[in-house]
Amino acid sequence: MSGAKEVRTKIKSVQNTQKITKAMEMVAASKMRRAQERMEATRPYAQKMRQVIGHLAGANPDYRHPFLEEREKVERVGLVVISTDRGLCGGLNVNLFKSVLQQMREWDKQGVGVDFCTFGAKAAAFFGRLGASTLADTRGLGDTPHLEDMIGPIKVMLDAYTEGKIDRLYLVHNDFVNTMSQEAATRRLLPVEPVDEEEMLENWDYIYEPSASELLDDVLMRYIESQVYQGVVENVACEMAARMVAMKSATDNAGEIIDNLQLVYNKARQAAITQELSEIVAGANAV
C-alpha cells in the first residue's frame, strides 16, 4: 500500500494548491471590478482635457508651445513603459515587452536611441538586464495607484523632452479590451497630437484670465499626467483580469490532476486488495 499512500499524499498536496489558486482567482476578480470602475471614471477626464487643449491652442494660434510642435529631426525617443510589480498574470508582461523590443528594433534601424521610464518591478528588472538607458524607475504603486507617486518620474521625462535630450515621448502599457483579452498599446504623449475636429464638439468664445497661453502651459502638464495615470490604472485592470484567468486555469488544471491521481490511487488500492485476497486464498488452500 506504500504506492497508494504516496498518491494519496500527492492528491492532498494538489488539493491544497487548488484552494490557494481558487482564492487568488476570487480576489483578482474582486480587484478587477474595482480597477475597471476607476479606469472608466478616468477616461472622460482625459478626453475632456484634449478638447480643452484644442480650444486653448485655437484661442492663441500665434503661441507655439514646445509640447505641440513637431521636431524636424528625431534622434532619441522616450518610452514610458507600464508593467506589473508581481507575476502570476499569464503572458501579460511578456507580450508587453515583446512589443517594446519590436519598437526598439525599428527605432534602431532608423538610428534613433531609446530612453526608458519604467513603472513596475517587472519592467525595471527586464530593462535592467537588457542594459537599457533608464531615466526614471517607479515601483510599488499597488492596486490603487495615486497620481502623486507618478509626478516625479513624469517630470523627469518632460524635462528631458524640454531640454532636447529626447525628441518624442511615448506611453506603452496594456490596453484593457475585455476580461479575456488585453493588448499591448503604444500612444504618443509628446508632441501632443493635434485635436481632431470631431473632438471639438463645441465652439468656445471665452475671454481667458490668465491668458490662454498661460493656461495651456498648465493644462498640457496635467494632460500628460492624466494620460500616464490612465495607463497605470488600465494596466492594473489588465493585471487583475489576466491573474483571474491564469488562476482559473490553474484551478481547473489542478482539478484534472486530482481526478487522474484519484484514478491511479483507486487502481493501486484495488491491486493491493486483490493481492491480499490472493494471498489469503493461497494460504487457505495450503492448509
Curated annotation (Swiss-Prot):
One of its GO terms (molecular function) is proton-transporting ATP synthase activity, rotational mechanism. Keywords: ATP synthesis, Cell inner membrane, Cell membrane, CF(1), Hydrogen ion transport, Ion transport, Membrane, Transport. Its main location: membrane. One of its GO terms (biological process) is proton motive force-driven plasma membrane ATP synthesis. InterPro entries: ATP_synth_F1_ATPase_gsu, ATP_synth_F1_gsu, ATP_synth_F1_gsu_CS. The keyword Ribosomal protein does not apply. CDD domains: F1-ATPase_gamma (cd12151). SUPFAM superfamilies: ATP synthase (F1-ATPase), gamma subunit. It is a peripheral membrane protein. The keyword Cell inner membrane applies. Transmembrane segments: none annotated. It comes from the Bacteria. Belongs to the ATPase gamma chain family. F-type ATPases have 2 components, CF(1) - the catalytic core - and CF(0) - the membrane proton channel. CF(1) has five subunits: alpha(3), beta(3), gamma(1), delta(1), epsilon(1). CF(0) has three main subunits: a, b and c. This is ATP synthase gamma chain. It comes from Alkalilimnicola ehrlichii (strain ATCC BAA-1101 / DSM 17681 / MLHE-1). The gene is atpG.
